[in-house]
Structure formats: structure tokens, C-alpha cells
């Protein structure tokens, strides 16, 4: 006859936080192994693409990481993707160029 298995925690319902797997112990007993929930991948604030180089962890594990494991060595590392940062830099450069051109045209018209 099959061995009966009961939950090992007080929560008796099949909820998202109470997911289990059946395992066999070295003593040949069958037990429930409680499975931790998966972490979500951090995403870029501008484009929404997953950020590379940053682990997908639950909030508590993520808070335990050291500072350099939570980010990438770049401007806006850990917040924006590389392409989003590149686009911001190019846009800022073009805006500055446009301001300079506008000033030059104003000076030319005053002469």
C-alpha cells in the first residue's frame, strides 16, 4: 500500500505559497518538499526588456546581495538596459547640438 504524505507546515490548502514536490529520503520515506516561489527578472524602466547580469531572486534574497551584485558597472546599471542608456546619450547629445545650432543662427541673424 502507498505511504500517506501530509503537509509539513500548518497551511493545509493548495495555494501558490504552499507548492510541494514528493521526494524520497535516504531512510526510504516519502515526504513533501516545499518549493520556494521563483523570483521575477528585473526589467528595464524604459523598454521593459529583461536586464542582463542581474539575478532573478525573491525580494528577501535580492536584499541580501551585495551592492555590486545588484547592478551592472555602467551608468544606470541595474535600472536601464544598455540600449536604453545608449539612446538617452544620443538624444541628449543631439539636443545639445540643436541648442548650439539655434544659438549660432541667432547670432548670424543679429549681425
Swiss-Prot record:
Keywords: Cytoplasm, Nucleus, Phosphoprotein, Ribonucleoprotein, Ribosomal protein. GO terms for cellular component: cytosol; cytosolic large ribosomal subunit; nucleolus; preribosome. The keyword Transferase does not apply. The keyword Phosphoprotein applies. The modification Phosphotyrosine is found at residue 76. It is found in: Cytoplasm; Nucleus, Nucleolus. One of its GO terms (biological process) is ribosome biogenesis. InterPro entries: Ribosomal_eL34 (IPR008195), Ribosomal_eL34_C_sf (IPR038562), Ribosomal_eL34_CS (IPR018065). GO terms for molecular function: structural constituent of ribosome. Component of the large ribosomal subunit (LSU). Mature yeast ribosomes consist of a small (40S) and a large (60S) subunit. The 40S small subunit contains 1 molecule of ribosomal RNA (18S rRNA) and at least 33 different proteins. The large 60S subunit contains 3 rRNA molecules (25S, 5.8S and 5S rRNA) and at least 46 different proteins. There are 2 genes for eL34 in S.pombe. Component of the ribosome, a large ribonucleoprotein complex responsible for the synthesis of proteins in the cell. The small ribosomal subunit (SSU) binds messenger RNAs (mRNAs) and translates the encoded message by selecting cognate aminoacyl-transfer RNA (tRNA) molecules. The large subunit (LSU) contains the ribosomal catalytic site termed the peptidyl transferase center (PTC), which catalyzes the formation of peptide bonds, thereby polymerizing the amino acids delivered by tRNAs into a polypeptide chain. Belongs to the eukaryotic ribosomal protein eL34 family. This is Large ribosomal subunit protein eL34B. It comes from Schizosaccharomyces pombe (strain 972 / ATCC 24843) (Fission yeast).
Amino acid at each position: 500500500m502507498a505511504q500517506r504524505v501530509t503537509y509539513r507546515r500548518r497551511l493545509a490548502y493548495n495555494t501558490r505559497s504552499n507548492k510541494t514536490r514528493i521526494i524520497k529520503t535516504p531512510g526510504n520515506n516519502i515526504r513533501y518538499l516545499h518549493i520556494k516561489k521563483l523570483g521575477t527578472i528585473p526589467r528595464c524602466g524604459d523598454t521593459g526588456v529583461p536586464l542582463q547580469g542581474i539575478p532573478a531572486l525573491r525580494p528577501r534574497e535580492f536584499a541580501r546581495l551585495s551592492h555590486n551584485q545588484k547592478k551592472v558597472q555602467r551608468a544606470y546599471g541595474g535600472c536601464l538596459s544598455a540600449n536604453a542608456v545608449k539612446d538617452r546619450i544620443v538624444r541628449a547629445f543631439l539636443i545639445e547640438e540643436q541648442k548650439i545650432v539655434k544659438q549660432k543662427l541667432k547670432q548670424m541673424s543679429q549681425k
